[in-house]
Amino acid sequence: MSDLHTATENVLIDERVRGFPPGNPPLPLDAIGKQGWKPYDGRMALPLISLDRQAFSGNVELMMAYVKSHGAEIAPHAKTPMSTALAEALLAAGAWGTTVADIRQAAVLLKAGQRRLILANEIGGAAAACRLAALLGHYPDAELHIFVDSTALVDALRTAWQERADLPPLGLLVEFGAGRAGARGVDAAEAILEAILAAETPAFRLTGIAAYEGAAATADAQETMRRIDALMAVTSDFLPKLRVRIGDERPLLVTAGGSVFFDLVIARLSAAVAADPACRLVLRSGAIFFHDHGIYERGLAGLDARGGFRIGGETVSAATAFRPALRVWAEVLSRPEARLAICGMGMRDVAMDQGLPRPLVLYRNGAYFADLESAEVFRLNDQHAFVALADGSDVAVGDVIEYGISHPCTCLDRHAILYGLDPDHSVTAAYLTSFG
């Protein structure tokens, strides 16, 4: 619902949105958390997506403590929830800024009042540079740092900034890459650096180096480590090269770090950043605050195996300390076979690119009924989930199943509202999303 994307807390929500009870009078967003609804009590329209607010808060506290203990900063990636309220909550918890993936996402955050952004992506050519300039012309107090991996993009941005006098300063981050965008090697990065320095003005400046190690991952764990090590090494080694060209006093950023290999970023880049008093290391992890029952569950198990999650000199199990905060709730529509249930949830409602949803708990008649340890989703259609059941299962039509998900980034984008739950699963908040 695109009309929600510029909404305030006073926007009226109705049954056009997943979860909202059919026939209920429209409600302001901030009233939804006062109705006493529960996803399994029969009132809410299913499927819907929910956020365990306690788990989310715990994940935020844990990640902020981790970053602080390593002398780093974090600009959480807003592409995961695209919720301005949750982005503001992360800033209030100590985030240095916010990361976005494109110009539209930047517009969402700027309109919400945020001013320090990392645009962690290349944006295209001259037309895209003009679109970015058109946006930032409305926000003269913005601080935006953007990835660049070609002289063509540097030239396009330079031209756009030369043509207008009403733009805030633009910070350029030379991106090194492996597997996706980013300069391949020092020679390419030096050409980009020279193009930036030749065009510098007070409003158009080099502000650091960037990388994204997650794109370097492959199916082979050892090859993944080799590729990430190489990417971090070239990123780290380039910092003193910048200092030779620009001097020691200019503040610089070194930014990397998703939600799976951020421990390697800390381990490989911290020393170089610590040796530079005017430099700060900024992670961009976003999905970590939501965690999941799939790709990030596996990712944090890998982090633990590397012995990488250390806070204040102590090793903590990331796999147990972080808690999955997202659930999708769906009703059983059919029991056509003894070992099969069909549920009202499909590809339009839940992610499937990094694993299928996981049945967790069964509810019946508005109350907890049983854990679903042996049930498994094995296929999704547009609107249906195929759930394999154990022999003798008494899952019944009308039961509600609580599912864990895999990959928050491609699950949340299907939903206009994320329902915040308290520990007894009552809805106590509602968060608008702005996925366009």
Write out the residue ranges for each language-model feature.
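A charged N-terminal "starter" segment
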Residues: M1-A134, Y431-G436
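Conserved, mostly hydrophobic/aromatic
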Residues: F56, K79, L109, V174, ...
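Flexible, glycine/charged-enriched surface loops at secondary-structure junctions
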Residues: A72-E73, V244-L253, V397, L412-H415
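Active-site-proximal beta-alpha core segment in soluble small-molecule metabolic enzymes
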Residues: A75-A221
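Active-site loop/helix belt of alpha/beta enzymes
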Residues: Q162, L167, G177-R310
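Active-site loop ensemble at the mouth of alpha/beta enzyme cores that anchors a bound cofactor
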Residues: F262-R364
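C-terminal accessory subdomain/extension
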Residues: E337-G436
